[in-house]
Amino acid sequence: VGMEPRRDAESLRGARRSTSRRLPRRAAAGRRSFTSTLKALDDLAASGAKISVRITDLDRGTSVLAGDDFVTLPVAGLGVVPLLIEVAAGFEAGRLDPLEIIDRSRVDPVTVGGVWQHLKAPALPLSDLAVLTAATGDALAANALLARVGLPAVRARIEELGLSRSALLDLFRDERGPDDAPHFALGSARELAEVFAALVNSQVVSPSVSAQVAEWLSFNHDLSLVASATGLDPFSHENDEHGLLFINKTGRDAGIRVEAGVLAGPRAGVSYALIVCFDDLSISHRLRAHDAFRVLGTDLMEYVF
């Protein structure tokens, strides 16, 4: 398992700030405007959607755009990020063996997403499960990792990272009953953006842990929301010929769309997070939510290039 810090990650320097602004009254001063993003988010908010957004300039360490970024909302599959951090920390400390084999039959079946459920391989090593979790949002692989490290350990890691508005509540489930947690995970846009900024600046646990988690996240195949504006190949975008540095993670559930990541080009680098909780009453409601993410992606590309 490669645990060396990435050189391009080290080149992105930024401090974290806790400044917040309510939607939607702040855009990048003196640089690119986020007018289109603000309009798209205003339209969503007017339709009753709950929105939390944060963009931070990595070089300046200042807020570029913030709206209700302190509000805790469901983040669906983006909750695997602290799980991956705990797994990487376990590898580094020797508490976990990356090649330890986990048998699928020992994990309760879940079909909400991912590919392991469709593979013939009945068992995989922890390191491969981490790759599946990051790359394909594999719920079964994530549950296997969570069963191995334990929910208390991930919650302790979240507390250690200072994420007071984030929580991993439960396993992935096909259906949530009255005795189950209502969501897989919770978070705020500010904390999500901070975590991704810290990852590329080698500040999460240690440089090697940060590099490992950033590497896993760089395999993510879901470039359909904010990342759709990058023009990157969903299946091969680790080394972009145009000098674009990009990692992201998305979260999806009924009426929930979330994306957080880092986007850096020759002009600037940003960490970003957008959470939208909406009434998924029709395809038009869903597409309107998706469109807001894509508009943000276009504005971010203009900002970094």
Please provide the spans of the model-predicted regions.
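A short glycine/serine-rich beta->alpha loop
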Residues: 66-74, 115, 119, 178-181, ...
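Active-site SXXK
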Residues: 61, 74-102, 272-274
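Short, glycine/proline-biased beta-turn/loop segments that scaffold the active-site neighborhood
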Residues: 93-119
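Structured C-terminal helix/loop/strand segments within mature extracytoplasmic catalytic/sensor domains
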Residues: 4-45, 64, 71, 199-233, ...
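Short, conserved catalytic-motif segment at the N-terminal edge
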Residues: 49-72
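Conserved catalytic neighborhood of penicillin-recognizing serine enzymes
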Residues: 109-143
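Short glycine/serine- and small hydrophobic-enriched flexible loop segments
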Residues: 85-93, 147, 194-201, 302
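Mid-domain, small-residue-enriched loop/turn segments at the edges of structured enzyme/sensor domains
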Residues: 47-51, 146-201
